[in-house]
Amino acid sequence: MEPCQLIERSIIKKYRKELWTPFIVAVKRYELVQAGDKIAVCISGGKDSMLMAKLMQELQRHSDVPFELVFLVMDPGYNEINRQKIESNAALLKIPITIFETDVFAVANNSDKSPCYLCARMRRGYLYKKAQELGCNKIALGHHFNDVIETTVMSMFYGSQLQAMPPKLHSTNFPGMVLIRPLYCVREEDIIAWKRYNDLEFIQCACRFTENCTTCDNGGGGSKRQEVKVLLRRLKRDNPNIENSIFRSIHGVALDTMPGYKTEGQEHSFLERFDRVEAELQKELKEKQKQEADKTE
């Protein structure tokens, strides 16, 4: 059996419960793939996007729903070693990648703004644009379960809002394009276990700026996301179910208990509903009093 076949087998067999099953759960629960879709699977070269590419390949092979895949790699300015690593891994995993070049690293690193934020925004814009040029209606990104819960906690601690990472969303700048996150229910620890089991090596953040950056979200000691990772790891010792609780909480928001919320860019207050309910109660009370008065006559 070829190396690629063994790797594919590990997804379907050994790590079926950890990888394949939660992947399928996300695809079905959030309706990520529909008949006729042409999906650009966006590959950064890291473990998450490479696994996502293999999962999407397997889904296409075994699904009754017909859809197309394009495996898109944007080169933002990789050095030769990282570029070769991505290409060799794609060859090993038999992923037919389409590569296109941009100057994202150069622009982001010379900006006065947060380079990591700018890099992420520019990357997504280029991916949307290229995917649209190739006739795709969706792009797939490799955000996983842990990204979801960490983003939720970060928004509370540092963003002063309750905000999650949705499993799919419409692009505001590229009409007709949809972003999907097929790894939404897949845990990072299981991705790492699969990578190690198959003795695979992938690139991490390849930006030269992050080597000495203490505030970037690249997994370094100064990262806010890394702080949240450490916090959740510590809390998990006392409450092993804490990650599931956070994940389920964003699926069961009790909106009626919130003093304020925002939807479709509009802010709302609980007073809107409070006043409406009070008016309805007053109306019901008057009707009841009228009925009782009619009975006594």
Feature names for model-found ranges:
Residues 1-154, 158-162, 166, 170, ...:
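ATP-dependent adenylation/nucleotidyltransferase module used to activate substrates
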Residues 16, 20, 83, 124, ...:
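A structural signal for well-ordered alpha-helical scaffolds and beta->alpha junctions
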Residues 49, 82, 116, 153, ...:
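Alpha-helix boundary/capping detector
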Residues 69, 146-232:
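Catalytic subdomain that performs nucleotidyl-dependent activation
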Residues 118, 140, 182, 186, ...:
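A short glycine-/small-residue-rich loop at the edge of a beta-strand within enzyme catalytic domains
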Residues 122-134, 168-174, 229-249:
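Short, basic, helix/turn surface patches
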Residues 200-297:
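The feature marks non-catalytic terminal segments
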